[in-house]
């Protein structure tokens, strides 16, 4: 009963539905219905303000992980020197301002979904570490050599053309292939 009530409350909080009846929106809804029950990684592409975050939330809410955490990270908003600590956590004393142990976003999302928004803005070094977690399903916090297993479905979004970024050498091709198991393109609003 408590689980059911939690789901109902989460739907009220997260319950933003995609509006519109255009063929493009209907196709996105159809993709969400097909993809949500799987654990496949999804890359959501579209211009700023098109609703990529809404697509990610709807994927999580319709998934088998909907009762588990949904954690969002805006990769563009976190300075490159902090992204590793933010995503993977850190141990007390691992750097000057690490006054206590901190669980990263991957650990916080364990069992649920991690949404990496604006992944195209992530540094190559951070991309390599994300790739390692996706491949091995484990991470180690900054300042630790202990592996922590994580079970996380990763959704990512970008407003950039990642194939062009790969050609420029600013995005890892292997990470692109890991993230783009399924690609959902969100049309611009014009």
Task: Give the location of each predicted region.
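Receiver (REC) domain switch/output surface
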Residues: 1-2
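AAA+ ATPase active-site-proximal loops
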Residues: 7-149, 154-160, 165, 188-189
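Short, solvent-exposed beta-strand edge segments and adjacent coil->beta transition regions
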Residues: 13, 181-184
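ABC-type ATPase nucleotide-binding domain
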Residues: 57, 178, 182
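Charged helix-capping and loop-helix junction motifs
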Residues: 168-171
């Amino acid at each position: 009963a408590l689980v059911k009530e939690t789901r109902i409350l989460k739907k009220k909080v997260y319950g933003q539905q995609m509006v519109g009846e255009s063929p493009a929106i209907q196709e996105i809804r159809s993709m969400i219905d097909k993809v949500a029950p799987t654990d496949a990684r999804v890359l959501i592409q579209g211009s700023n303000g098109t609703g990529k975050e809404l697509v990610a939330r709807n994927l999580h809410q319709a998934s088998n992980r909907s009762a588990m955490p949904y954690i969002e990270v805006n990769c563009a908003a976190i300075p490159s020197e902090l992204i590793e600590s933010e995503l993977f956590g850190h141990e007390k004393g691992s750097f000057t301002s690490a006054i206590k142990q901190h669980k990263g976003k991957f650990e916080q999302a364990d069992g649920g979904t991690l949404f990496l928004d604006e992944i195209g803005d992530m540094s190559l070094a951070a991309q390599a570490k994300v790739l390692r977690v996706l491949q091995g399903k484990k991470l180690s916090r900054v300042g630790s050599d202990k592996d922590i297993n994580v079970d996380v479905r990763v959704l990512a979004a970008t407003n950039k053309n990642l194939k062009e970024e790969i050609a420029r050498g600013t995005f890892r091709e292997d990470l692109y292939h890991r993230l783009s198991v399924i690609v959902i393109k969100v049309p611009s609003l014009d």
